[in-house]
Amino acid sequence: MDIEKVNSMDFGEFVDVFGNVIERCPLIAAAVWSKRPFSGLGDLEKHFFAFIDGLPLSGQEGVLRCHPELAGRQLPWGRLTAESQREQSAAGLQNLGAAERLRFTELTAQYRTRFGFPFVLALRLSDPAAAPRELARRLRCPPAQELRTALGEVKKICHLRLANLLGEQP
């Protein structure tokens, strides 16, 4: 869709279309709608990012908590959003062997315990084999640094999802 179509959307349609570009956070799309008109993809994403950046720490952590565990319990039960399902499937996380899945699950549990939110990674920009290494590396980061890194991954995911919706190259 083109930016003129985006700018002509009523509130409900905008939230329906863009409500999950930040995982399970339609409130952000609801707030961004009022910033119309947008000049293009960069302008649209700027408003999503500014909303996240303007949140207090508890709100930023809440945004992160809306993300599913990578290769977690939601994956086999079909409880992922359509976007997360596609992203995790394309990354091959559904194809992990039993031992790999167990190790990844252990690391994600350690991560959640340490930081209080799930490990977030823009899978479409990553080598699937690198996800466990990246998780292990980020487990060693100081909490404030990891919060910034995880929010950066949320923004990458948002950019990719917005580009997909607007039919643009990421």
From Swiss-Prot:
Pfam families: OHCU_decarbox. Signal peptide: none annotated. One of its GO terms (molecular function) is 2-oxo-4-hydroxy-4-carboxy-5-ureidoimidazoline decarboxylase activity. Keywords: Decarboxylase, Lyase, Peroxisome, Purine metabolism. The active site is at residue 67. Pathway: Purine metabolism; urate degradation; (S)-allantoin from urate: step 3/3. It is found in: Peroxisome. One of its GO terms (biological process) is urate catabolic process. GO terms for cellular component: peroxisome. The keyword Electron transport does not apply. Substrate binds at residues 68, 84-88, 119-123. Its main location: other. Disulfide bonds: none annotated. InterPro entries: OHCU_decarboxylase, OHCU_decarboxylase-1, OHCU_decarboxylase_sf. The keyword Transmembrane does not apply. Its EC number is 4.1.1.97. It catalyses: 5-hydroxy-2-oxo-4-ureido-2,5-dihydro-1H-imidazole-5-carboxylate + H(+) = (S)-allantoin + CO2. Catalyzes the stereoselective decarboxylation of 2-oxo-4-hydroxy-4-carboxy-5-ureidoimidazoline (OHCU) to (S)-allantoin. Belongs to the OHCU decarboxylase family. This is 2-oxo-4-hydroxy-4-carboxy-5-ureidoimidazoline decarboxylase.
